[in-house]
Amino acid sequence: AECSVDIAGNDQMQFDKKEITVSKSCKQFTVNLKHPGKLAKNVMGHNWVLTKQADMQGAVNDGMAAGLDNNYVKKDDARVIAHTKVIGGGETDSVTFDVSKLAAGEDYAYFCSFPGHFALMKGVLKLVD
């Protein structure tokens, strides 16, 4: 099984993937985030945040309040399963999480929590056999 994925977020506020599948056979899964754009992180920064679908809006709202210094993720937010830091154009970051944190049949969402981005920059993560 492929236990990692590469995803890019650009200056047009788009991820290049709308869906990520994670195999149950993976013990851990790694997300490699790349920003192929030119704009700085304080202007057009992107991160990759994973929550349950139902938790997305709350995590986004609290993340905005947390600010850029905290990567727009509330400190110790139990709803956030995994997240990268916020990166700007030309930068990369990765995050690895335990697949055991995912439950079969649950709906998971990934998104960028930079203010105003999640409406366009989001996708679905699925646990598969």
From Swiss-Prot:
<dbReference type="InterPro" id="IPR008972">
    <property type="entry name" value="Cupredoxin"/>
</dbReference>
<keyword id="KW-0479">Metal-binding</keyword>
<protein>
    <recommendedName>
        <fullName>Azurin</fullName>
    </recommendedName>
</protein>
<feature type="disulfide bond">
    <location>
        <begin position="3"/>
        <end position="26"/>
    </location>
</feature>
<dbReference type="InterPro" id="IPR000923">
    <property type="entry name" value="BlueCu_1"/>
</dbReference>
<feature type="domain" description="Plastocyanin-like">
    <location>
        <begin position="1"/>
        <end position="129"/>
    </location>
</feature>
<feature type="binding site">
    <location>
        <position position="121"/>
    </location>
    <ligand>
        <name>Cu cation</name>
    </ligand>
</feature>
<dbReference type="GO" id="GO:0042597">
    <property type="term" value="C:periplasmic space"/>
</dbReference>
<dbReference type="Pfam" id="PF00127">
    <property type="entry name" value="Copper-bind"/>
</dbReference>
<comment type="function">
    <text>Transfers electrons from cytochrome c551 to cytochrome oxidase.</text>
</comment>
<dbReference type="InterPro" id="IPR028871">
    <property type="entry name" value="BlueCu_1_BS"/>
</dbReference>
<dbReference type="InterPro" id="IPR050845">
    <property type="entry name" value="Cu-binding_ET"/>
</dbReference>
<feature type="binding site">
    <location>
        <position position="117"/>
    </location>
    <ligand>
        <name>Cu cation</name>
    </ligand>
</feature>
<dbReference type="GO" id="GO:0005507">
    <property type="term" value="F:copper ion binding"/>
</dbReference>
<keyword id="KW-0813">Transport</keyword>
<keyword id="KW-0249">Electron transport</keyword>
<keyword id="KW-0574">Periplasm</keyword>
<dbReference type="InterPro" id="IPR014068">
    <property type="entry name" value="Azurin"/>
</dbReference>
<keyword id="KW-1015">Disulfide bond</keyword>
<keyword id="KW-0186">Copper</keyword>
<feature type="binding site">
    <location>
        <position position="46"/>
    </location>
    <ligand>
        <name>Cu cation</name>
    </ligand>
</feature>
<dbReference type="GO" id="GO:0009055">
    <property type="term" value="F:electron transfer activity"/>
</dbReference>
<feature type="binding site">
    <location>
        <position position="112"/>
    </location>
    <ligand>
        <name>Cu cation</name>
    </ligand>
</feature>
